[in-house]
């Protein structure tokens, strides 16, 4: 098998625009969570040049964010799971992005994983939502690491973002909407929420996930804004707003609904 082609256990899928991504057939795969995180991050900092994606997994959030930035923008990623960073490395190569993306195999909780003095205009993260011991552990290690808090929680993501966020920069993350830690973690780490979007997966239900855009408190951030996106309407079909979001992102529309 050539490195640019998927094995029997992998797929090579469209992510955004003409960029593609390698994924395991039965592993962790990119989702709406990743796309909305990239969407709000790029909207918050459209002229960002130095991007960091923490806990980057297979690279979906970082790639989708970078795609929406100017060609001069560059991306650094941090990922602990070897299988995920290996897939991301191949995605970088197949998209011709080797000169724009630097992949780091390590733990985002370790300040030494990046060079001293590293600072970024745009930071993204998709923390796992489930505390260890509170849910059923996936038998697939890659999935387990993406869903369970095996290497820290949203508090660790916010602490790391605070460490590497440049003055005037923005940290955007996606998290469970109903979890009180979603709001508490930024505040506990000197970050102010400047925007929150909630995502209702089925009309009439509570929001399932939320994206928060944050800034350093000492940067005198602007007043907080909010928004809501409903994914499926009362009839179970994709809403016009959701399909418009997919078009704006340059991401293929869902196949069903």
What are these regions (language model features)?
Residues 206-257:
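SAM/dcSAM-binding transferase cores
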Residues 88-89:
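Conserved SAM-binding loop
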Residues 127-156:
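Mobile active-site "lid"/loop adjacent to the S-adenosyl-L-methionine
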Residues 74-79:
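Conserved SAM-binding motif I beta-strand of class I
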Residues 58-72:
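Conserved SAM-binding loop of SAM-dependent methyltransferases across substrates and taxa
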Residues 48-55:
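Conserved class I S-adenosyl-L-methionine
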Residues 113-123:
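A short acidic, Gly/Pro-enriched loop at the edge of an enzyme's catalytic core
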Residues 30, 151-208:
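Conserved Class I SAM-dependent methyltransferase catalytic core
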